[in-house]
Amino acid sequence: IRAPGGTGTSSHTMTGTSVHLPGRITNQRQLALMMATGREITGKVPAARWDVEAAVASSTDLGEAVCNRMKYGAFIESAELFDCRFFGVSPAESTAMDPQQRLCLEHGYQALHASGLTKADLNGKEHGVYLGFSCQDFAKCLENHPAARGVYSATGSSQSIASGRLSFVLGLQGPCALIDTACSAGLTATGFAANALTLGECALAVVLAVNIMLVTDVHRAFALAGMTSVAGKCFTWDSRANGYCRSDSCGACVLQVAGDVGEEQLIALLGTSVRCDGKSASLTAPNGMAQKRLIQSALAVAGAAG
């Protein structure tokens, strides 16, 4: 399944995945079914995250549209649950860990397990970990509640530790990096992992992306900027589009050099390319022509350019 004439990442394959999304979606089949049926997974911000009514009440001077944009999102239920002892983490340290770190441990391991690998198979191997990670809400929670800070707070809220913790727990000694390019962080992490495989820096890489919303700050800022939907719904490529809806998520996949695996593969990775918009209408606005060139570059790497 290698693309004819491909010169880049065409010898890489995906061998295992793990996912946890709103709507109690915990596997690829459930995700595909949700997409096929159009089931909605967005809704009002749950009280377990923050007091949305209080946040809206303190923002009424900003107008009805901004207040409505602040009310909605898509949230993972029971994101705080974690089997700490399975990963050799004490209850005290687990309590001080960003839920995003816990989810990365769970789904990084589950993706490797889905690839047929055990803890014994992984320890001491030069496998890579590449994590797309942008949200820093847990650190903000600690800032807002000084009494909750303790000996594990620094590592529990650190971005760099989020990727390093999986390598530490599983004994992985390959490249380990956290990539923050906002909403493209997961795709950028995939591109970096593919390049590492191509360069021989590792023969296997775990790619993860995670986002868990815990405080209202970013919600409010995006509502003010008009980025988020008034009705809490995404209408992509649709005349009804009026913004997007922020969401929790965690996903992981395992990429390997194709020659190192047998027939069990989910996807062949034919080509990747990573670029930046450069100058556009504003700092956060997309650049259509730059995105077109990015797609053309990835197709060329895959040997599939027309």
Descriptions of predicted regions:
Residues 1-306:
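Condensing-enzyme catalytic core of the thiolase-fold
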